[in-house]
């Protein structure tokens, strides 16, 4: 029978490495005590958001406001002493400190008035910060403080007043901050600290990219966030493929951005050069009837000149035909994708100007195909080859895009399990009988969790596979499949009917049939089967995005008897009319799980100027019988393992198997 001593002896190599960080019994014991104390703290608050679709202003505001949590803290601290309008103004200062601060200072017409405002505001922010920091250890709060003013903020937040006057103490420190011209800096730092501490973990359940104006701003913010994970959406993986240099993914990304007149983001933010594409487009399509290629526009982002619209439309047509050619090639290379019926350029009757879809033929809305050889429709002409070469080079050499996509790979996955919640963007493909759909890839069968794991691994091949290797090519093709494939867990529909919507007038061909999953996820037993497939008990939750909840028509985001929550509420401006709302945030605190429903957001400029907040309705989904502590979470399991290892290290020191460092600094 193995003893604890046997286990320690087996772990000596690891314990010797651990001893580098804790070189004495005292140091190890101190860390044990610290970790055991952490286990008894309340669980940190988690926020879940999905389907941001590049809508940066709404996302930034919801991130800054912590989905309404910060306003609740302001009201809790100051509700009895401060009028509503003043609380709204203070909340706006916390959300946008660098933008709001100059506006508020302008009101102070004298030095005395400014000093009084500084004093009042600093004290109010300190009180709010003390509240939001109460769930954290002092060490954790210290680690969040900027080095330039961390010591003073630590004193302000953690001072005790048993034997001295609080007002006098605070007054002396705040007065010194103002006197030395540091008030602005301290206000900004306190606002940032409040936002940091209000949300412990952020989960983004897919689709950062799409038609919205600035996905790059969203990714810049997420890269600076202290604790975030991402579950890839189908819009994300096609950008991942584009950054990897996949021609089909590059064309797909360009087609979407041009269809919504958002190519300026590609040019200005990512430095993608569209000059060669524009030149080729004008050469072959400049005189065509471009009526079906005109971009969708947002009046709020206009005005648009005819020249701007023409430039966009002609590139839209050029890149779409290039994309349809490449789709034929990818389908040829990957028969296991089972997409042979979607090589539409090969299904056109060039004499009758019709295309065959299934068993029927339909007239084409646009019959001009000057770059297509009817004898070999998938073949690129020399001009298209040159354009594609330049585009691949531009996407591969975009430093900012590569940083963003590496971040998506580092922080992202097809699914994620944390604290009893299963997170994924699209679906776990199912059949009509409620079982998991079976797919065959590379000679093997996959379904359920195994399919999701396979998709994750092959998606990584497309970016990290060796240059020029078959594995890299296969992975890039698969990233495109994840975008639009029939059994893609990120797509969850029968087909992406892009060709049909462009070229065929009959709306019956535009239908994208949802995976049976979207019927079965209303069934509690089916949701429990999904949870069991991922090793979770039936009391856990599934957090799902991808399909906008039509709340205005009475649809509920709560499915499967409360086991599943759909959190796609339509962040994207284009979906507001469809959903009747402007997004959800799921909030999981130590006491409750709640869903916050957001109303449309006008603009950051108006929010700063008029103290306008996003109106959000809070709906409690579950209330815990007892407050959830860190020891009840996945983090708690990690901490317990850490304590176990440290206790073994202490024993190894006591047995003399690992020598202690002789340093008085470790005596306590």
Predicted regions mapped to residue ranges:
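Feature recognizes metal-dependent phosphohydrolase scaffolds
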Residues: 1-668
